[in-house]
């Protein structure tokens, strides 16, 4: 493995930021550290970079134990959330900064800066200053500067957080394509699920300093292995009285159910399938238009459940009556999570994850 974290612990006063953190990264992979604020993901990134020292545990990069190495000795490039460009330097000088610190000659620096400007599609802007660039352009320059010394590992701390939504979407695609092109092993921190799912080869879910689950985006989304992951990923509804729902039995005391919006099929009352007894009678409690669909909160026998309604169903508003069929749910028992299909679909309906 190219990067290995083994039993990492880190405490800041009374707060344990990392609790026995262990995971591995293959060479050339793009990894997303995903979790809520305060979950420890940025601390992990900073310890890999050498900007924070772990209290215990080992970090390996390219087979080398780096515990005692300084950031400059680890061969790591770091892209900060707020760009951290030098405002008094031109684009050229910002990218060249690390190369000058390394003592590279002028010819090499010019060649490398030109190469990186082409890579980030900003050739011709080398004489501009950071305040003359857009947010997206500044982030590209920050990436070029991090790549200039040819690091072995690229670390990005919420690289798109300070950028508006449209540009952020474009930069996700661009970053994925750029990292694939140069083949550098990379780790980025984010609290945005869509970003992690779209960009990462693998996702590391963090919570309260612990690693909850590691896997590719599809596996993380479809097969959550812990209670936290099941509740955190997706726009889920969490309910305890799920035995009220048609096609599901209560699995016992201490259990709860997680229902994703895509598990719910909605019909208007005039639909031919509306008389199917397996469908729930539901009332729209809240409806938000999302452009390509309506995001709704349903009241089903007192249970609040999120769902999506396609435009073909027409506009939905608070108080509308609809029919809802719930295909499946995740049952959580302690830290065990498993899928249960609606019994009207299959007699053998339990699938352990």
Regions found by a protein language model. Name each.
Residues 30, 71-77, 81, 85-225:
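ABC ATPase nucleotide-binding domains
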Residues 34-36:
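The feature captures the beta-strand-to-loop junction immediately N-terminal to the Walker
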Residues 42-45, 141:
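ABC ATPase nucleotide-binding domain helices that frame the ATP-binding cleft
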Residues 49:
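Helix-to-loop junction immediately C-terminal to a conserved catalytic motif
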Residues 57-65:
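Conserved ABC transporter NBD signature motif
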Residues 237-288, 313-353:
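Glycine/charge-rich catalytic "coupling/switch" loops of P-loop NTPases
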């Amino acid at each position: 493995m190219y990067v290995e974290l083994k039993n990492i612990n880190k405490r800041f006063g009374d707060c344990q930021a990392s609790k026995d953190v262990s995971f591995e990264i293959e060479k050339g992979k793009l990894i997303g550290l995903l979790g809520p604020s305060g979950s420890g993901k940025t601390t992990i990134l900073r310890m890999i970079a050498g900007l924070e020292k772990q209290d215990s545990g080992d970090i390996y990069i390219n087979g080398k134990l780096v515990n005692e190495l300084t950031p400059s000795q680890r061969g790591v490039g770091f892209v900060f959330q707020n760009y951290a460009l030098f405002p008094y330097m031109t684009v050229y000088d910002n990218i060249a900064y690390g190369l000058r610190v390394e003592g590279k000659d002028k010819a090499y620096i010019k060649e490398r800066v030109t190469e990186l400007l082409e890579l980030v599609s900003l050739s011709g802007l080398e004489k501009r200053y950071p305040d003359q660039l857009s947010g997206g352009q500044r982030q590209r320059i920050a990436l070029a500067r991090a790549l200039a010394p040819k690091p072995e590992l690229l670390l990005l701390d919420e690289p798109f957080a300070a950028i508006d939504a449209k540009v952020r979407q474009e930069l996700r695609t661009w970053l994925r394509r750029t990292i694939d092109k140069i083949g550098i092993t990379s780790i980025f921190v984010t609290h945005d699920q869509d970003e992690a799912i779209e960009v990462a080869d693998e996702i590391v879910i963090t919570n309260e300093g612990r690693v909850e689950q590691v896997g590719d985006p599809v596996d993380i989304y479809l097969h959550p292995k812990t209670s936290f992951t099941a509740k955190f990923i997706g726009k889920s509804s969490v309910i305890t009285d799920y035995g009220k729902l048609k096609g599901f039995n209560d699995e016992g005391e201490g259990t709860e159910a997680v229902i994703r919006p895509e598990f719910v099929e909605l019909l208007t009352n005039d639909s031919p399938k509306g008389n199917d007894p397996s469908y729930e009678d539901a009332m729209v409690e809240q409806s938000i238009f999302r452009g390509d669909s309506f995001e709704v909160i349903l009241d089903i026998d007192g249970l609040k459940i999120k769902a999506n309604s396609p435009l073909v169903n027409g506009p939905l508003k608070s108080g509308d009556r609809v029919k809802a069929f719930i295909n499946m749910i995740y049952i959580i028992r302690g830290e065990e999570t498993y899928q249960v299909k609606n019994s009207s679909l299959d007699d053998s309906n339990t699938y352990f994850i």
